[in-house]
Amino acid sequence: MRIKFISLLKGTAYPLNKELLYTIANNISSIGDVEVVDNAPDLVHVFGKWSGTTATTMKGYTHKGIPVVFTSTNGLVDVLPPHSLMLAPTVFHCCGPAEAELIKKLLPKASVKVIANEQFTLTTDRTTMLRQFNDLYAKVYNEHEAKVMSEINNKVRTLNISDHAINEICSQLLYLQYAFRRETIRQRLLDNLSDTLINSNYDEESMRQAFDTLKISSFATSVMALLESKSHLTEGFMPIAASDDKTTKQMQKHII
């Protein structure tokens, strides 16, 4: 899992949880299967104040479909109702139950997780804290992915087609479209789609009709060109003609 840590701290202020970010970012990779990155994250952890700037930053990621964990750098100190109502992370991380209770009071539907900062309590230690964060990141990411796949499956069901191959190919294309939106296209997604296209039998006209119904025909033509240049698909296995266009070139930039 690729995680990006963002600090929105400015000036010479020394908030309570300033060191927490650096502790997690510098040590989390030793606990689980985590890679700390600057680009193409699977999940983002934002440390900042309860402010409009923080809200805008988080919205930029959630709009792309990237889950966000938020930690208030000053705990309860900066919690103000006008600001809190603008914040919409996937999960609020709190260092104590009082902060969690206040967030739930202000935002009853918010998802909140309490993980104590080991610098300020004897009830935990660094290793335990890091494991809790690793578990939190995995849970947030996995639940987000499950939600994405559920939405994709619901879209594919609207086709009302019994052909498994068409349903599977459409599902993979829709997930690739989602990966493109979040600017994180893994090579294995391309190779898996190439394999599925090569090894599946389907009616090409029905496939093209499915693309039209899902409004992904244009995207599919761009993907065919991408699979030809960056994977192992050849023209004979394409259900729709390839188009090496602007979208193809943009997708190439986000392959990891």
Segments predicted by a language model, with ranges:
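A short, active-site helix/loop in glycosyltransferases that binds the activated sugar's phosphate group
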Residues: 89-111, 121
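Short glycine-rich, flexible loops that bind phosphorylated cofactors or substrates
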Residues: 51-53, 77-78, 101
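Short N-terminal targeting/anchoring amphipathic segment
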Residues: 37-53, 67-73, 183
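Membrane-proximal helix-turn-helix segments that form the acceptor-binding/catalytic region
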Residues: 75-91
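Conserved NTP-donor binding/palm subdomain of two-metal-ion nucleotidyltransferases/polymerases, i.e.
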Residues: 135-256
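C-terminal alpha-helical cap of glycosyltransferases
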Residues: 119, 123-145
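N-terminal pre-catalytic "stem/leader" segment of glycosyltransferase-like enzymes
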Residues: 1-43
